């Protein structure tokens, strides 16, 4: 029996909270700006 992979969920994660999705909306850009200010190495997923 084959094991279940996480390919689908990681794709969904990118589509929901990826960098390009964040840059689309005003609030998403605010999230990126805040994370840059805090010095996060990972701005988005």
Swiss-Prot record:
Matching Pfam families: Ribosomal_L34
Keywords, alphabetical: Ribonucleoprotein, Ribosomal protein
GO molecular function, one term: structural constituent of ribosome
Residue ranges, annotated region (Disordered): 1-27
Keyword Ligase: no
Compositional bias annotation for Basic residues: 10-27
Mitochondrion in keyword set: no
GO cellular component, one term: ribonucleoprotein complex
GO biological process assignments: translation
Family: Belongs to the bacterial ribosomal protein bL34 family.
Stored NCBIfam families: rpmH_bact
Protein name: Large ribosomal subunit protein bL34
Organism: Synechococcus sp. (strain CC9902)
